[in-house]
Structures are given as structure tokens and as C-alpha cells.
Amino acid sequence: MNLGDGLKLETELLDGKTKLILSPYEHKSKISVKMGNKAKIAKCPLRTKTGHILKSTQDTCIGSEKLLQKKPVGSETSQAKGEKNGMTFSSTKDLCKQCIDKDCLHIQKEISPATPNMQKTRNTVNTSLVGKQKPHKKHITAENMKSSLVCLTQDQLQQILMTVNQGNRSLSLTENGKEAKSQYSLYLNSISNQPKDENIMGLFKKTEMVSSVPAENKSVLNEHQETSKQCEQKIAIENEWKPADIFSTLGERECDRSSLEAKKAQWRKELDEQVALKKKEKEVSEKWNDPWKKSESDKIIWEKHQILDQSRETVLLEHPFSAVKQELQRKWIEELNKQIEDDRQRKIEEKIIYSKGEEHDRWAMHFDSLKSYPGSQSQLFSQSTHKQPEYFCVSPDTQELADVSSVCTPTTGSQVEPSEEEHIAKPIKDVVMANSKKTNFLRSMTALLDPAQIEERDRRRQKQLEHQKAITAQVEEKRRKKQLEEEQRKKEEQEEELRLAQEREEMQKQYEEDILKQKQKEEIMTLKTNELFQTMQRAQELAQRLKQEQRIRELAQKGHDTSRLIKNLGVDTIQMEYNASNISNSRHDSDEISGKMNTYMNSTTSKKDTGVQTDDLNIGIFTNAESHCGSLMERDITNCSSPEISAELIGQFSTKKNKQELTQDKGASLEKENNRCNDQCNQFTRIEKQTKHMKKYPKRPDWNINKPPKRYIPASEKYPKQLQKQREEKKVRRQMELLHLVEKNNPGHLSQNRGISPEIFHSSHQETESKLRWHLVKKEEEPLNIHSFSKERSPSSPVPVVKNRTQQTQNTLHLPLKNSSYERENLISGSNQTELSSGISESSHFIPYVRTNEIYYLDPDAPLSGPSTQDPQYQNSQDCGQKRQLFDSDCVRDPLLNPNMVKNRDRQQAILKGLSELRQGLLQKQKELESSLLPLAENQEESFGSSF
């Protein structure tokens, strides 16, 4: 172990000078880095900003020509494929170089968000120190300078310059040098996505591609020349480094050109020495034998670095791109592509082999989860060792960073030295062995079972199989039933279709038969109607001839000259034959028209139902034909004979359209034919009504809307006038009977009548009845005379039975008694006359009938049994009664109607008094009963209400 191994140092600025101090582990510097731009401030602190673990891997010489041997180290991670690439680190001798690297780190961190291809780059730091060696500014090599470069585009560089200029002055070429350094360093980190076996020519070409932007068209030569100048300037002003600002080393331009030229010459000399050293290192690397077969990859990497150094050297020459170099570049590119393809194939094969083994271990771990598989654990570590060649680390700090990245991304393993890999894998194996030594009482999934459990499993399996069989049997049974039901349903549907087809055919046949029968009936009807018309014509002709002959004979008997009539008779017979033929033809035509009209009416009714519109022309044709036929028939009949006979025939034809008298004369043989003829005539009359209606209403009615042309007439007005009158009188009489029954059943009626005179009672009663009959009086066209009586009378005559015999008899003295119809007429006429005379409506009281043959008329001059009053209405009624005549003297002899005929007045008064007392007693008894029943009814109502 060398001095300084394992120490973590940290730089600190004290009084403007940089000093190294020991820093504890897990310590992070709190020095905030402030940029010149106020808008862009570095927010993410660096993890290994200033602390570095120093590890010396080779003894160094203090001489100015001797340099430290550089060893590669791999500490990069890949997010996508898990591929690793080696990054070269070179050791420096100066502490001031660490400050330069820190500045590069800060610039790199600032630029990394702006370059998306560089997001996962690693911060590379040159950290090797020589123990107890003082810093030498003159021994800064080109490798040391260019290992900390960053590749930037011109736009990014201009943006950084503008941000710095906002806080400071314009940047000098030193800042450009810094940017170029950071650019180159980031480029080395950005090649991590490429395989490790690519040669240095590919790197050189990609360096050209990155550095030569199409917009700028800068060459690699200018980049490296500019870089060398910047490094010299930085070294020159390094003693004047100020801690206040990290850009303080970048901001000032060297004014002394002579010193710059001297520095440039010294720089070229050091580059030549570096080229010679690289050649020696290449020879040494070829002789190495790596036990993990890393010699090939190491060789490739050393070749890359050698060619890179050579390219850097040739960049400084005057002719960097000669034809020979281009040929070499082409060959190297071809070789590099071939190596890349071989490496890719080898990786694919390794992945396939590893995936097979991993699958087997995974399944074994699944079934025997308690067993430990150390091979599978170690395989995860061997994956990282066998995948890619790896390099020695400069310090464990970079290894720690790689381990952290491997923890974050499990698919990528960190590349460490073989000794360290064994050191990491060993404790894991120990943990696995310790876990396997523990006693496990749990039975794994593939462990053996006892016979009881095996039998139980077999029994369960058998049950499950039986259950599945039962389920399948049920499913099959359901499917079979469903299939049978489907077949049955289809069969029923087919039978139903056949049945419907048969019914349809039968209906069609029946319809055709009905049509044939209808046609036959129509033909028979037309034949019979023709025969009927012919017989009617012959009968008419015969009747006319007979009448003419009878008239001639009568005139001859009276002595008149009948020669002209006989002559006319002969002419008339010829004309009658001609007219008969015309009439027969017209009748035949009318039959045809009637047949057409029947079919037309049927069609129109059907069309009316379906709402199909017909033409006006058809109706006009038929109505014209019908009117023409009717006029032709009338004209023929009028021209048959003489004017007298023709007038008689016209009267017969007009009044008796159905020819029933002629059929009665002919006999019963023509009754059926007359009925058929009547049907035909009714059809013609119907058509005539339609034509009249069309004439009245020329506008056709709306379709499917039955608008009645006549006003609504109630059924009661359709009766004859006499019947209407009788119905109204019956209605009034019924109302009067109901009114008397109500008054008769009223208990206070008789008691009220005692103190009221019969005239007042009579007048009030007449007023109530006159209101009921007033509508009948209005309907009378003329008032009937009181003395006009009907000749027909019923044998029974009414006798007034008065409810209150003491009062009602005097009220009804002036009313005549007759049969029902005559009584109603007299009542109406009496009420009309009293209305005309006095203006006060009065009507007779209801009088029931008694079995007697006489009609009694009371004497108006007879004294009244009650107190007399001077009622003008009663006097008017007496005047009306005086005008009446007595038909029979027996009416005066009646003691009930005529009080003058009463011989024993005392007896009559005693009878009336007894009746009044009896009535009063009955009324008193009724009141007592009502008063006794009222509390009982109230108690019952209360009990009934309380029950609810």
C-alpha cells in the first residue's frame, strides 16, 4: 500500500491560495458556485466537487522529462443497453491543475442541460498526485490538458459568452480554451453509447464530426491550435488566480506576444516527448496477457489513445490531412466496422446463453423457494465481469460512483478490478450459505407427500372429475333438449305456414265463388226487372185502351159523335206500340244504368272508406243519364194518349213510384217482382237525392269528414204535433201529481190552511201550477174556446175529491169536469183566458176521477162554507164560471157541489167539526211522536259517532 491510498482530500481557498485538507467521508463542499449570468445559476451541487481519493499506482520521477504512466479506468454507466466504455484518466503533478479541472467541472455542469446527448456523462477528474512533490508548471502535457476538454457548438459558445458578458467584460481567448477543453472532455464521455472495440480512427472521425458543425465549417486543426494557445495563456496567468470568481482565470488576455511564442515552442517540445512515451506504452500493452481475456480490448484502447495522441500531434503540423492519412483512415474505419459487428454478434450469443440459464434458475427458485442457489447469485456478478473488458481505477471514488449507478440501474453492472469483484461477491456468498444452514421445517412445493395426503388428493381429483362429467352431461342434456325444442318449433312453424296457405287458398276460392254468384244474381235480377217493366208497360197500355173504349161507349150512349175518337183510338194504338217499344228500350237502358250505378255505389263506398278520391266526371255522367232516363220516361208517358188519360197516368206514376196498385190488380203473382222493382226505384230515388244535394251544395265535401248538411233535430221534435202536445201534457200532469203528493205529506200544510181563506190558498196554488204550465201555454197557436167541447167523451166522468172538504170544494166550483183530453184543453184555455183578462196566471187544481156518468157544474152563487173574501182573482173566476152553461140539471142537485141543496146544515157542520177535531188530534199525536223520536235519534247519532 502506497502512501496516501484511501485518503480523501479536499481543496480549500485560504487567503487567495489553494490548499489541500483532509475531508471526512460523506462530506460535501458547501461552496456555492456563482456564475456571471444572473439568470442562470448552478442549482445542482456536485457530488464529488472537490474531494478526491488519491491512489498512486506507479512511482514517479521528479525529472521534467519523466511522466506518470497512465492507466485506464472504467466508471461509466448506460441507461439503455447497459454498455460500458472506458474513460482515460491521466495524472498530473500540479495542484493548480486540480483547480483547472474543477473549473472544467463547473463549466461542464452548466453546459450539460443544453446538450441532450450529454445528460448521463460522468465528471472526469485527473487526481493523481505524487507524494511530497512540488507543483511544476512546466510539465503540463497535452494529454493532461485535453483530457478536460468539452465539445461545444458555436451557438452554445456564443450563448455562454453572452451570459458572461452580462456580468463581466467580454471573455478572452482563455475562456474559449476552457470551453474547448470541456468540449473535448464531454465528447469522451458521450462515446459511451458505442461499443468498446472501436478503434481510434472512429473516435477521430467522430471528433471531427462533433467539432466540425456545418454552420461553422471549422476544422479539427483550428480547434487544437486554439486549445494549445488557451492552455498556454492559462498557465501564464495561473499565478494571478483569484478566488472571488471562477471565471477570473478566463477573463484576461496576455499582452506579451513574445512570452506566448516561447510558451508555444515549449509546448510543442512537450508534445513530441508525449508521442514518444505513447509509443513505448503501446509496445508494453501488446505484451500484456490479461487472464480475463482483456488484452484485445486493452490493445484496442491503447491503439485508440495512441492514434488520438498522434492525431493531436499531427493536428499541430502544417499538413494534417494528406492522402496517406486519408487512406489509413479508410482502412481503420473498415477494420473498426468489422470489429463492431463481431462484438455485436458475440453479445447476442452471450445474451441467448445467459437467458437460458436464467430461465432454468428462475423456475427452480419458483418451485423450491426455500432452497438457495448461489450460482444464480454469483451469475449476476459474473455477468458484469464477462460482458465487457474493464480497466483499473485511478481511485476508489470513481468506483463508488459506478457502484451507485449500478444500484440505480440493476441491469448494468459496475466494472471493477478482479480483486474487488471477488471481494464484493464473497460476502454475498457467505450470506447465502448462512441462510442455507438454517433449519427449515416448512415443506417446499416439490417435497414428497405422505400416503394420506396422496389419497386425499386422488379422492379430490376423482370428485372433481366426476363433477366435471356431471356438468358436461347436464350441458349435453340441455343442448339436446334445446335442439329438440328448436326442431319442434320449426316443425310447428312449417305446419302453421301450410295451414295459413291452405286457408288463403280456400278464401280465394270462396271469394271467386261469391263473385260468380253475385254476377249470376245480378243477371237474373236484370232479366226479371226487364220482364217486370214489360208487363207493366203492357198493363198500362191495356188500361189506357180500356179507358178510352169505356169513354167512347159512354159518349155514344149520350149521343155524342165518337167517330173522331175512334179514329184517334186507331192512331193512338199505333203510337202506343211505338211508345211501348221506346219505353221498353228506355227501361232496358235504365236497367243497365242501375246495374252500373250499383257497382258504382259499391265502389264509391269502398273508396270513401279508404279515402281514395274519385273524379267528378263519373258522377256527372250518371246523374245526367239518370235525369235523361227520367225525363224520357215522363215524356213517353205523357205522349201515350189523350191529355186526360196522360194526366191520370202522370199522377199515378208520380204518387205511386213502386207500382203497388198495378201489382194488386194483377194479383199476388207480381209481389216479388214489385219488391225487386221497389229496390231499383229506391236506388233511383237515392241517386236523385244525391243529385239534388249536389245542386244545393256545389262544393264537394272534404274527404273522410262527415259534415251533416242539416241542423241537429232532437228526437222529441220529430214526433207529430199532436203526439208532442200529449207528451207535454202528461209531463205537466205528472209534475202536478208529484207536487200534490208533497203537499199532502207535509204535516204543516193542513194547520196552515186553517187560518187561510180558500181564495188565498187557491190563488197561491194556481200561481205554482201556472209556472209549471206556462211553457205549454206559449206553445199553443191559438187559444181554445171554452164552449167548444169534444164530441167523443169517455164513459167515466171525474168527481172532485177535495183534500180539505171545507175549503177545496169552494175553490173548484167554477171548473168543468170532463174526460182527460177535454179537461187538459179546458185547463189550458182557462189559464189563457184568465191571463188575458187579469194578467195573473192561474191554473186548475188537480182533481182525481170518480166513477160516475154525470158531469157536475157547481153553482157560482152558492154561499161559501168558509169566510168570504174580496179577492179579485176569485171574482174573475166567478165571472168565468157564470158564463158557463149547465148541461145537466143533476149537477145542481149534488149536495157536495151545491151547498144550497144541503137540507140539514147542522148535521153537516157537526160532521165538519168532528173531522177537524179528529185532524187536530192526529196532528197532535204526530207532533208528540216526532218530539219523542228526536232525542232518541240524537242519542243514536251520538253513540254512532262515538263508536268511530
UniProtKB/Swiss-Prot annotation:
Disulfide bonds: none annotated. Keywords: Cell cycle, Cell division, Cell projection, Cilium, Cilium biogenesis/degradation, Coiled coil, Cytoplasm, Cytoskeleton, Disulfide bond, Microtubule, Phosphoprotein. PANTHER family: COILED-COIL DOMAIN-CONTAINING PROTEIN 66 (PTHR22736:SF2). One of its GO terms (cellular component) is plasma membrane. Residues 458-499, 690-713, 788-808 are annotated as: Disordered. The modification Phosphothreonine is found at T115, T121. The modification Phosphoserine is found at S369, S606. GO terms for biological process: cell division; ciliary transition zone assembly; cilium assembly; detection of light stimulus involved in visual perception; establishment of mitotic spindle orientation; microtubule bundle formation; microtubule cytoskeleton organization involved in mitosis; microtubule nucleation. It comes from Homo sapiens. InterPro entries: CCD66 (IPR039183), CCDC66_dom (IPR040467). The keyword Coiled coil applies. It is found in: Cytoplasm, Cytoskeleton, Microtubule organizing center, Centrosome; Cytoplasm, Cytoskeleton, Microtubule organizing center, Centrosome, Centriolar satellite; Cell projection, Cilium; Cytoplasm, Cytoskeleton, Cilium basal body. This is Coiled-coil domain-containing protein 66. GO terms for molecular function: microtubule binding; protein homodimerization activity. It comes from the Eukaryota. Microtubule-binding protein required for ciliogenesis. May function in ciliogenesis by mediating the transport of proteins like BBS4 to the cilium, but also through the organization of the centriolar satellites. Required for the assembly of signaling-competent cilia with proper structure and length. Mediates this function in part by regulating transition zone assembly and basal body recruitment of the IFT-B complex. Cooperates with the ciliopathy proteins CSPP1 and CEP104 during cilium length regulation. Plays two important roles during cell division. Homodimer; disulfide-linked. Interacts with CEP290. Interacts with PCM1. Interacts with ARMC9, TOGARAM1, CSPP1 and CEP104. Interacts with CDK5RAP2, CEP152, CEP192, TBG1 and PRC1. It holds the Pfam family CCDC66. Widely expressed (at protein level). Expressed in retina, mainly in photoreceptors but also in outer plexiform and ganglion cell layers (at protein level). Residues 570-948 are annotated as: Mediates localization to cilia, centrosomes and spindle microtubules and the interaction with PCM1, CEP290, CEP104 and CSPP1. Residues 467-558 form a coiled coil.
